[in-house]
Amino acid sequence: MVESKNTELSQGTWLNKPKSVFQEAGKVTLETDEKTDFWRETFYGFTRDSGHFLGVETGSAFTAQVRVQGSYESLYDQAGIMVRIDDGHWLKAGIEISDGHAMLSSVLTNGKSDWSTAVYGGNARDFWLRVTVEKGVLRIQVSSDKKTWPLVRLAPFPTSDHYLVGPMACTPERGGLKVTFSEWSLTAPLGKALHDLS
């Protein structure tokens, strides 16, 4: 179960709160600071934990969902959702600029980071993300209309009695990415079959 007293974004805790951020009921609008990122070691050799993350504490199993509206421009501009245990165990997923295109991107970190990208056929400037964690499995889904939710990634994920989950944004090469997060929900796991896209 969610096992959380406070499931609203307003009850979240910032990791690296951006200098420019506005929070109102059910909505967070921010502008990223210079050279912010989440990454651990792989390929590049560096570790960065400077990205913006608004984490809402939850229990051992949950489904979280959020709408993401962003004005991506430069290499590695990214915004989406993050699930985090600590600085060495986390997942971030969303839209990221790579090779001149807005890609559907996910990074799973278990000591070291991996990175997976795919072409996104919807509107990269306005989309929804859903993440479910239950019994050591993490499932990410994306939607362009909040009705159909194809799978982005299914992966093992460390079990924990609690997680932090919420909006994430980074700009490793610059600052100034403007993003609005809204339509946030945090509930018990939806319990849908893997190929149930509703």
Swiss-Prot record:
GO terms for cellular component: cytoplasm. It is found in: Cytoplasm. SUPFAM superfamilies: Concanavalin A-like lectins/glucanases. The keyword Cytoplasm applies. Keywords: Cytoplasm. It comes from the Eukaryota. Present with 721 molecules/cell in log phase SD medium. Functions in the galactose metabolic pathway via the GAL83 protein and that it may control the level of ENO1. PANTHER family: REGULATION OF ENOLASE PROTEIN 1. This is Regulation of enolase protein 1. It comes from Saccharomyces cerevisiae (strain ATCC 204508 / S288c) (Baker's yeast). The lineage of its organism: Eukaryota, Fungi, Dikarya, Ascomycota, Saccharomycotina. The gene is REE1.
